[in-house]
From Swiss-Prot:
GO terms for cellular component: cytoplasm. This is Cell division protein SepF. It is found in: Cytoplasm. InterPro entries: Cell_div_SepF (IPR023052), Cell_div_SepF/SepF-rel (IPR007561), SepF-like_sf (IPR038594). HAMAP family: SepF. Signal peptide: none annotated. Belongs to the SepF family. Its main location: cytoplasm. It comes from Syntrophomonas wolfei subsp. wolfei (strain DSM 2245B / Goettingen).
Length: 142
């Protein structure tokens, strides 16, 4: 589980049963613009939320789907969920993600990320982790 702990730290998320985190992006400021330039500021006042959840039953899928509809990212950990329940939840949330034109990817054996359409997932996560120093932190298999 050491590699996943590194991934969680890289994502800036501490492992908890359910955790919502607000990431504040810096707002545009006139003070940042000194003199005439051709640079256009792309900062916005939007906040993005990441919901980390360890679902225990299929009854939670509506709440999870509502998070996606609200444009929140979901990280689902199925380590303590029965396999048949996990598969049903993954199927439901995958359908929700598809209908919202979102994205999904498996991060680990039982860990998945689902994002709304405004958030893309880098497909080559291993090279990103190597770039940021998180690949193979404990000397295990590459």
């Amino acid at each position: 589980m050491g590699v996943m702990d590194g991934l969680w730290r890289w994502l800036g998320v501490e492992r908890e049963e359910v955790r919502e985190e607000i990431i504040e992006l810096p707002a545009y400021s006139e003070e940042n613009q000194r003199g005439p330039t051709n640079v256009v500021s792309i900062h916005s006042n939007k906040t993005f939320k990441v919901v980390v959840c360890e679902p225990e039953s299929f009854d939670e899928v509506q709440v999870l789907a509502d998070h996606l509809k609200s444009r929140k990212q979901l990280i689902l950990n199925f380590d303590n969920t029965p396999p048949e329940v996990s598969q049903r939840i993954i199927d439901f949330i995958s359908g929700t993600t598809y209908s919202l034109e979102g994205h999904s990817q498996q991060l680990g054996k039982n860990i998945f990320i689902f994002t709304p359409s405004n958030v893309e997932i880098a497909k080559d996560h291993r090279s990103l982790m190597r770039k940021h120093g998180f690949a193979n932190p404990f000397g295990g298999e590459k």
